[in-house]
């Protein structure tokens, strides 16, 4: 990691629904409200945004809407992680093409990747997307923890912009 790409207030938004469908009108209002409140960046389709319940088509529309609404007034970070490296790479590339400023990629869940597997996963995403990526370590949700040693290796990746550490161990915040 060279220098911070994302600084200041970064809000992880919920994904509003109306019935069984994403409420894009309400999402636009939520984005606008966060921008007016001073958000420096907004995360769309992360854990708070119910990413596992969304289709890729819904995610891409959410990202497109986010970029359109923000109009450069704040950065848009797209949640593109998956339990499938190929799917995470594909969604990351598509999000990048839509003009998002960065990606939040949760560790692959369910499959309990090895540490070398995590490195390969993040390398595939960072190499393919070509924009800043934040690795998201949340072992309580994914079943796998990015080790301190692996964090050190990830920081050497050109496009890795940071690590969102949610393992519950405050002592790891210095990594």
What are these regions (language model features)?
Residues 103, 135, 158-169:
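Catalytic beta/alpha-barrel core
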Residues 2-11, 15-145, 151:
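Active-site beta->alpha loop and helix N-cap motifs at the rims of alpha/beta catalytic domains
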Residues 73, 157-158:
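Acidic-histidine catalytic/liganding microenvironments
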Residues 173-175:
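Conserved small/polar residues in nucleotide/adenosyl-binding loops
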């Amino acid at each position: 990691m060279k220098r911070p790409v994302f600084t200041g207030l970064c809000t992880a938004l919920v994904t509003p629904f109306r019935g069984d469908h994403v409420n894009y009108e309400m999402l636009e209002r939520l984005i606008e409200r966060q921008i007016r409140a001073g958000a420096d960046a907004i995360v769309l389709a992360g854990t708070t945004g119910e990413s596992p319940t969304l289709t890729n088509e819904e995610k891409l529309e959410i990202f497109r809407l986010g970029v359109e609404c923000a109009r450069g007034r704040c950065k848009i970070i797209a949640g593109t992680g998956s339990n499938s490296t190929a799917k995470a790479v594909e969604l990351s590339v598509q999000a990048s093409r839509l003009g998002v400023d960065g990606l939040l990629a949760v560790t692959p869940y369910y499959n309990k990747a090895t540490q070398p597997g995590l490195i390969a996963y993040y390398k595939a995403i960072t190499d393919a997307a070509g924009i800043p990526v934040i690795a998201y370590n949340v072992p309580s949700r994914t079943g796998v923890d990015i080790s301190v040693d692996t964090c050190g290796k990830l920081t050497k990746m050109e496009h890795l912009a940071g690590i969102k550490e949610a393992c519950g161990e405050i002592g790891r915040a210095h990594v």
